Amino acid sequence: MSSINQFQAIGCINRPPQHYEKEDSHFITFSVKVTRNYLSRNQRPMYDFLNCKAYGEVAIQIKEVFKEDIIVAISGQIQTRRFFHNDEKRYATELLVTQFYPLIPTQMRSTCENLTSPTQI
């Protein structure tokens, strides 16, 4: 049965992925910068920064492929979690990536910045 909890996004890796390994268990976190489909009042592009994570074989593959400033397509599920930090209850919403596709390998940050026009995505 197909789940209705699914997302798809195309964006730019905006910081190097952080890989963790504990007892043969792999985990990676990264952030994807995506362009909104409208401009700010100053006619500048607006962005969202999606916090993503992946586990296991997907994490290992992402570690090998993802570098800062490459353009990727990702898909997976949205999940929320609750945790305590300094005795304060906090919530986080994260994207659990189960599939990914590098789209354009870039050599310079400017290539990712060229995806700033809302009409391009």
Annotate each language-model stretch with its function.
Residues 55-90:
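Beta-rich strand-turn-strand
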Residues 44-54:
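Short histidine-centered catalytic/ligand-binding loop motif
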Residues 7-15, 32, 68-79, 97:
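OB-fold and OB-like beta-barrel modules that bind single-stranded nucleic acids
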Residues 1-5, 10, 16-26, 39-45, ...:
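Acidic, gly/ser/pro-rich intrinsically disordered tails
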Residues 29-34, 51-53, 94-96:
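Short, acidic/hydrophobic/Gly-rich beta-strand patch recurrent on exposed beta strands
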Residues 35-38, 82:
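Short regulatory "switch" loops immediately downstream of catalytic or recognition motifs
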